[in-house]
């Protein structure tokens, strides 16, 4: 899951979030193979409910959501909302806002999705039970991969960070489309119709100048419930919600600066012995606060608000309930699915991203970005194999409780492929990037 705001500002957050994800995943694996494994499984299967009168918000198909279902289908909607906000911003003003900017990362991402699927299918043929996991190695974890890249500090050219971020965003778009198209059950269109009407309502309310984020989120919860009942995976509701969040601020920067200057010029001076603000001073400060809120668009404001919750709560919880790989028990721990996923992430991502980038540049379709070369592209192509979050998510959708042995194999493949890709990518970049003077 971050994209271009200021790469330097987010380096520290990416590193911390990546470490937290890694530690949480290790903790889950340790607990799942310890005497506390039964407690861990009970936690995952614990049923939840949120009742308002006779209505239970956390119910689906006649049963309460379990803890793992609530996290995967509920809390992960917040993650996908943030992903949607990032995608929308990149499409409007970022690295996907024009063909010139988007061409190379788009082509690289296509290679990074197609080749892993081909490699997976060579190990687990489509049509078999294992073949259901074809889409697992398609994804790149933005936060995790940028976190590893950030460990190299100022040695990394900004263009390389932009390239990694942009092709990971395109990967996310591909992953979202796969989830929406291939991992939806029987569709109940009446629920989707109500959800569509609410989206249209939010769109026109936003066009009329509404900026209350709480209102959009409350309606978003209603839409999430409708998706949960519809058969379309509920996390998709978060992505679509992002596209009706207003992206235009109420004040432009020029007007904001003029207003702040005027407020400061008329700000009452403090008395020599005063330590408490006067009512007039408080009123002026509230004007500053109001103007500052209006110069930030709801899209950017909500995205900023969600980063902390997603990176330090939602994703660690997701890792904890999904990374509990069993190293013993019924069935093969390491099987064809493990190999297919690990090879897809490690070899497939590298070959796909590197070869498609090479073809795009050598054919003259798009130029090589300033500050990048084939050596550091090879390192970033390896980092593209850090699948983790979305790969684990798709693994659960592919196999779920119906195929616990294959799901366990897929999780082991995701974890091993991610770790190897992260280590190799870091080492390659450490060797090829110029040393700091």
Curated annotation (Swiss-Prot):
<keyword id="KW-0915">Sodium</keyword>
<keyword id="KW-0997">Cell inner membrane</keyword>
<dbReference type="InterPro" id="IPR023171">
    <property type="entry name" value="Na/H_antiporter_dom_sf"/>
</dbReference>
<feature type="transmembrane region" description="Helical">
    <location>
        <begin position="12"/>
        <end position="32"/>
    </location>
</feature>
<feature type="transmembrane region" description="Helical">
    <location>
        <begin position="308"/>
        <end position="328"/>
    </location>
</feature>
<keyword id="KW-0739">Sodium transport</keyword>
<feature type="transmembrane region" description="Helical">
    <location>
        <begin position="333"/>
        <end position="353"/>
    </location>
</feature>
<protein>
    <recommendedName>
        <fullName>Na(+)/H(+) antiporter NhaA</fullName>
    </recommendedName>
</protein>
<feature type="transmembrane region" description="Helical">
    <location>
        <begin position="377"/>
        <end position="397"/>
    </location>
</feature>
<feature type="transmembrane region" description="Helical">
    <location>
        <begin position="214"/>
        <end position="234"/>
    </location>
</feature>
<feature type="transmembrane region" description="Helical">
    <location>
        <begin position="65"/>
        <end position="85"/>
    </location>
</feature>
<keyword id="KW-0813">Transport</keyword>
<keyword id="KW-1003">Cell membrane</keyword>
<feature type="transmembrane region" description="Helical">
    <location>
        <begin position="133"/>
        <end position="153"/>
    </location>
</feature>
<feature type="transmembrane region" description="Helical">
    <location>
        <begin position="103"/>
        <end position="123"/>
    </location>
</feature>
<comment type="similarity">
    <text>Belongs to the NhaA Na(+)/H(+) (TC 2.A.33) antiporter family.</text>
</comment>
<dbReference type="Pfam" id="PF06965">
    <property type="entry name" value="Na_H_antiport_1"/>
</dbReference>
<dbReference type="InterPro" id="IPR004670">
    <property type="entry name" value="NhaA"/>
</dbReference>
<keyword id="KW-0050">Antiport</keyword>
<keyword id="KW-0406">Ion transport</keyword>
<keyword id="KW-1133">Transmembrane helix</keyword>
<feature type="transmembrane region" description="Helical">
    <location>
        <begin position="186"/>
        <end position="206"/>
    </location>
</feature>
<dbReference type="GO" id="GO:0015385">
    <property type="term" value="F:sodium:proton antiporter activity"/>
</dbReference>
<feature type="transmembrane region" description="Helical">
    <location>
        <begin position="412"/>
        <end position="432"/>
    </location>
</feature>
<feature type="transmembrane region" description="Helical">
    <location>
        <begin position="162"/>
        <end position="182"/>
    </location>
</feature>
<keyword id="KW-0812">Transmembrane</keyword>
<comment type="function">
    <text>Na(+)/H(+) antiporter that extrudes sodium in exchange for external protons.</text>
</comment>
<dbReference type="GO" id="GO:0006885">
    <property type="term" value="P:regulation of pH"/>
</dbReference>
<dbReference type="GO" id="GO:0005886">
    <property type="term" value="C:plasma membrane"/>
</dbReference>
<keyword id="KW-0472">Membrane</keyword>
